[in-house]
Amino acid sequence: MILKSFLLGNLVSLCMKIINSVVVVGLYYGFLTTFSIGPSYLFLLRAQVMEEGEEGTEKKVSAITGFITGQLMMFISIYYAPLHLALGRPHTITVLALPYLLFHFFWNNHKHFFDYGSTTRNSMRNLSIQCVFLNNLIFQLLNHFILPSSMLARLVNIYMFRCNNKMLFVTSSFVGWLIGHILFMKWVGLVLVWIRQNPSIRSNVLIRSNKYLVSELRNSMARIFSILLFITCVYYLGRIPSPILTKKMKETSETEERGESEEETDVEIERTSETKGTKQEQERSTEEDPSPSLFSEEKEDPDKIDETEEIRVNGKEKTKDEFHFKETCYKNSPVYETSYLDGNQENSKLEILKEDEDNKNKKWFEKPLVTLLFDYKRWNRPLRYIKARFQIKKAVRNEMSQYFFYTCLSDGKQRISFTYPPSLSIFLEMIQRKMSLSTTERLSYDELYNHWIYTNEQKENTLRKEFITRIEALDNGSLTLDVLEKRTRLCNDATKKEYLPKIYDPFLNGPYRGTIKKMFSPSIINETSRENSIEKFRINKIYGILFAIDYREFEHTFDRKSLSTKIGYFLNLINQFTIESPSNLNLKRLSLFPEQGKVDSDSEDQAKFLNFFFDRVITDPKDQTIRKKSIGIKEISKKVPRWSYKLMKNEEEGETLVVYQEIRSRKSKHVVIFTDNQQNADTYTANANKDIDNSEQTNEVALIRYSQQSDFRRDIIKGSMRAQRRKIVIRELFQANVHSPLFLDRIYKPIFFSFDISGLIKLIFENWKEKNKKLKIPNYAEEKTREKRQKAKREEKARIKIAEVWDTVLFAQVIRGCLLLTQSIFRKYIILPSLIIAKNIGRMLLFQSPEWSEDLKDWNREMHVKCTYNGVQLSETEFPQNWLRDGIQIKILFPFCLKPWHKPQERSLDKDSMKDKVKKFCFLTVWGMETDLPFGSPRKRPSFFKPILKELEKRIRKFKNKCFLVLTVLKERTKLFIFLRVSKETKKWVIKSVLFINIKKIIKELLKINPTLLFGLREVYESSETQKQKDSIINNQMIHKSSIQIRSMNWTNYSLTEKKVKDLTDRTSTIRKKIEKIIKDKKKLFLTPEINISPNKASYNAKRLESQKSIWQILKRRNSRLIRKLHYFIKFFIERIYIDILLCLINIPRTNAQFFIESTKKIIDKYVYNNERNQKRIGKPNQKKIHFISIIKRSVSSISNKSSQIFCDLSSLSQAYVFYKLSQTQVINLYKLRSVLQYNGTSLFLKNERKDYFGFGAHEIFHYELRHKKLRNSGMNQWKNWLRGHYQYKYLSPIIWSRLVPQKWRNRVNQHCVAQNQNKDLSKWDLSQKDQLIHYNKQNDYEADSLTNQKENFKKHYRYDLLSYKYINYEDKNDSYIYGSPLQVNNNQDISYNYNTHKRKFFDMLEGIPINNYLGEDDIMYIEYIKKNPDRKYFDWKILHFCFRKKVDIEVWINTSINSNKNTKTGSNNYQIIDKKGLFYLTQDQEIKPSNQKDLFDWMGMNEEILNRSISNLEPWFFPEFVLLYNTYKMKPWVIPIKLLLLNFNGNKNYSKNRNSNRKQKGNLFISSNEKKLLKLENRNQEEKESAGQVDLGSDVQNQGNLESVLSNHEKDIEEDYAGSDSDMQKRTKKKQFKNHTEAELDLFLKRYLLFQLRWDDSLNQKMINNIKVYCLLLRLINPREICISAIQRGEMSLDLIPVHKDLTLTELMKMKRGIFIIEPIRLSVKNDGQFIMYQTIGISLVHKSKYQTNQRYREERYVDNKNCDKFSARCQKMIGNKDKNHYDLLVPENILSPRRRRKFRILICFNLRNRSGVARNPVFCNGNSCNKFLDENKHLDRDKNQLIKLKKLKLFLWPNYRLEDLACMNRYWFDTNNGSCFSMIRIHMYPRLKIR
């Protein structure tokens, strides 16, 4: 067996070697290149097909030979550089190929031009065979150069870079290509033979009908092929930019290019070499540059190697002394292109060229021809234009390579470097040419490598010896300060020993020490200057125009004499405006280009202006305060290649006054929505979707409207070739985005996969599913919202299509606009007045008073507002600009609706709520109809005759009622005056005539007047109408539901669907059956067969029955009926309750609202006749009380006394008791019952007496709902809204609710154990209460012995109790359960354990203890549950509302006190998170430690107070800082102490040390309400923590009035913090005294801008747009009051978005609308110094062993002073668990050395110099014993050796100073990456063991 496997393995490896060999790969690639068919194949195929005879054979041979020779030359040119250069020169082949194509075309079409006249058959004399050979050869060569071939032909070139044996690969690939072509030619020959021999083709009708077709085809074949060739060439040439007809770009102002021409570094030289070459065409096109430039560059022809730069000032020559030398540049060409160097050119390489003014103004014909025709650096290739972030920079050239290859020494070996400085390589080449070859000796590779190894080993040994000496001195007891290597610093004064400041010390900071306008790293900023370092500096825009910020800017002033006169002109012009308006520079009349004259640079105003530019003291124009200069460090960045011109998109034209645009962006139209006619008004609008067009007289606010068509332009630069773009398609007529066909499978489903597989399966298994179907409650809310969404999408698409059709058809907008205006005038002045006249004439004819005034008032109220094409309102008279071209809409405000009569304005509350959403506007269509949205479907207009018909029906009904009264009087008279002889026929006629009208109404009226008069009649009528009555009750239930939904339309926005009706129909079938059974029983008992005859005879039979039956029979019948009903009622009700209520609770997030709340209560009435007496009968309290879903808890005695089975009858929970408890409930929770209490109809479950008693204040109570902050969600059903009102549900995680699936819910939630704590005796009153709705069996008595019996039960179910006990806290002082509409809540309710285990909270992991500790002895089922539901242990980000204010100290994050042990009982403080949506308490174990620190640690390294903004939609990406923590937390939930994520303490740390015996509240002066609660919690007694119950916070919503007071406290705190009165800030530095509130706001806001990015809330975008639309109209109206009120009522305008104050501050703005600004932190890479990065790494990765085991041995609190080093060492000390001595430094012995030598030492020992193969590959983790010789003897370290080894590994892994940014810097310099992926290429090695050699 072993032998077989061995042989098999050898065989596989052999096969792999063969497959991967160069020969096989070459053959494969060569064979693939066979299929790269290009134009050269046309000649080959023509020779094969057309040539016959002897000459034809020779031509075939010559064609094949030429073809193969050409391909062989191409393969050889890959390997042989001279041939590649000859064929690959940019313009050689192109220039030669074009004339050859022309010659070939004429040769084939006009052969007599070239015919010698000889008819000899000598083929040598005839040039045709040679021409065939040349054609095939040359076209094979051209195929790769002038005619782009397919990708297959380039595969060989690609693989060449990977292959070592290149010649073998080229040979094998050519052989493969040859084999492929031989097969191809054979196949073509076989096909031709088959065509010739196949009789069916030859006998074709077409061929037979034309005898000469074949011969003519053969004769013209040459011409056909030449035409094909020409078409092919034209097509291929079309994909190459036309050399002459390309778009010429205009160059930007030269001042913007000074940054590129001024650079000196090698990297910059490389960049500038790539950015040149674009100016020739500009100089050609503009012939002469009209603007004298400050700096300009002179370029030579691009086919020369050397490109030098020069600087010109006003045409005067600068001397070498005035300028530094400019290093020469090298064109981005291969290194081996040295054969073109001319020796004379090298003399100019290091010279500054003399000024040559004529070169600047060369005419186009003076340029070289090749340069004129071909400039490969143009925007000809369809590249994307990447816009610069700031306007002062130009676009990045992303197609140029940033690499330059050259050989260099690296690690002692000569390697190819791909980022070698080009200037250095040229310099080396020049030096080598100048020096004779005899003087240069080249060392061998081995000698170089050995020398390099030797020197490095010497350095390493020296360092190692010094290092070990220092360590030994430390072990011998020397002072640490003596052992540590000192850092060299500069002194100011040697006698006083004062050092230079850290900022200016070159030994600390490197060579560049100017105060550069960047951010400093906090590690080298003194504590006092930290406040200044975060000042936001706004760059003056004029300064940015003049001086690009590409290079370092120092504080010393520039030499002003070196300025060009351009700046002089510029300053002179600006000077005029500074005199006119010193605060605002009005640049409208400013020209940057002077025409004549010079400026006296010594003028006083100009000097001021120069000071303004060069000193850069920016003043605030409002209060003239001078902002401080900020300090920072220049970031190291590579200069990227940029274009020499800046392109403009067409939407930017308005901003920058550019008349042209060079980028073809998406089609858009500027829609001007507001015009300000004030001259020279200074308007600036900072809204994102506004564009400002500053014309000379008007300021216009415009919106950009994009068409909905696909964007085929795709930001292509004008002049670039569209054919080279990736192909894009659309599938629909109007599709917003085009897609490439490559990705269609990801976007659209293929047609053959479009059918729904799940739907098919449903159809197949439908019958089987019906059999096994249980009663399920479909989620109608979600279905309905989904249907609505889809319907809205469909309508939106239809509207867009119509709009686009109007927008694309020629002259359609003109026609539509005229039609709309015509319809508007026709409607307003013809149709509506004529309708008013006709109506009032009709009223007068019908003797009604006319309503002229009311109708005319409504008619005058209708306004026809002209709108833009998108619906932005302008005014009634003002038309949009270019409305005939861009389109117009006409919006009708308060559209006139003709009414038959006008009602008075008194309306009830319910009707008002129903009409809330009626829109009072519409848009006019072309056909004169009304529509809600532009291009929407026409809406129904209210009918004029409908109210008339309704009124007629009412009148008829009244008339019937009068007839009923007449009939009643007649009947009474017949009984009283029976002696009157009324004829029988007369009575019959009266009764018949009235009964004929409506027999039902008669019976009801008679029953109301005298129930006993026609009692028999009623019974008879009941027999035939009972079923109908029952149906009407059921239907009444449905109507009741839908009416409730309509009434509460503003918060439940859906109605009953047909699906729900079908669902309910099944459920009512059983009711109907039982009702029919009751009816049949009644018929048998009380009715005789002859009774049931006809409605006419029913009255006589009823009389006969009444006379026969006695009263006791009637009572007996009634009792029997009730008894029968009760039996069915109880049986059915128990069944329904068991199924329906439980399923509703199981599927809480999906439960249908009306079904649970109403229908379960109305099921009672489905059996009860609509009769109040029956309800009273049911409501009698003589039956047993039930306990409904754990709301009413039984006492112990009641449990022990009850032994009978308890029926869960809902009716025994009397309504009086329910309403009594509701009256005790807080007002805030009563709006759940609004629909019940405010229902005006007959309530099917609520007694009128109770409702009238309780509903006395229903309207007043529910008026509170209007003030409730949390608006209801339109998609929620009533059950969810009912739960939303309970704060237990509101703040429960969806993860928890998802646990409530049927079986688990039954086992875990309802079978919870409840322990009642009465009189603090925990061991006496423990009991287990089972849910009554699940188990109906007897309840046992769990009294004193329940502790022992239920031990495992407690353990098993305890954590599920916490679901409703710990985490869910009501806002009053007591607990209430999860199902708890708070009818009854127990006080002092606790959960006790049989032994005092730490109380497990829901957030188990947040205390740093893994879940496994809990699962050891608990049930295994729960472990499986956690495995199946991994989200159980993860933190739910969407529930908590973060309250970022002041930040806690860093130690609070690390040193989380873990008060959890199996032998100690601990309690929990409740810290409060206050949000705008309400309050809830989150239980956490947390101790704030006393600390003497002055500064707060803010959590992510930000020493700022963060604004208290609630984040409702909190996603992990929202806070970039959280992403790292969130991902780490997902992998290891125990790693991060999450308390800092949950709780952010709002006070100063100093007050926490007041937890002394006196328990006084000192603290901060500005502690808000929740901070005071924190103080209360901190000051509570420790004994009080022994109780595991809820801590009484004593301040709930009632104490604080409402939520507004809480929010006002927040705002007060924000204001106080903004005003600079924060005590923490005052302790560190004195705050600046601001002159006014605005400046303080602005100052702190600008500081905050460094830390946060502002963005608009997504949900508010549409609101803002709607507001803009309304504002545009209101600004134009003289009296906008009515329109404004109407817009607010319609919801078009949000008052909270209108800034109404003049001097609006940030705080007030945030008060006005909470949620407009979402302030989210951005990455603070600039401020992250070494300590912070160190802490981040350790805080995530270091896990103290107490995080894994609940052990209190190492629990201690450290008090840390203010120094960074001590702070860090103490922090690490805490993690190690060392309490006495600080041995932190010994963990990393390298810390003895200075940082610079430390890095050197580290790199040297990292290199395993002797055993290297290319790259060092050391093990990822080193041996754990690497540092043990220093650490084994230490007895004070952590006792856990394994933990220490892990710690050492981590410490050795990091840089000793944790300066991870060093890696980024090394990476940047070594690998020259500038794309942000700093760590993408570097390999970090672990440090090997220290060795002594």
From Swiss-Prot:
Signal peptide: none annotated. Pfam families: Ycf1. The chain crosses the membrane at residues 18-38, 63-83, 87-107, 127-147, 175-195, 224-244, 1126-1146. Residues 249-317 are annotated as: Disordered. GO terms for biological process: protein transport. It is a multi-pass membrane protein. Residues 298-309 have a biased composition (Acidic residues). GO terms for cellular component: chloroplast inner membrane. Keywords: Chloroplast, Membrane, Plastid, Plastid inner membrane, Protein transport, Transmembrane, Transmembrane helix, Transport. Residues 249-258, 268-287 have a biased composition (Basic and acidic residues). It is found in: Plastid, Chloroplast inner membrane. Belongs to the TIC214 family. Involved in protein precursor import into chloroplasts. May be part of an intermediate translocation complex acting as a protein-conducting channel at the inner envelope. Part of the Tic complex. This is Protein TIC 214.
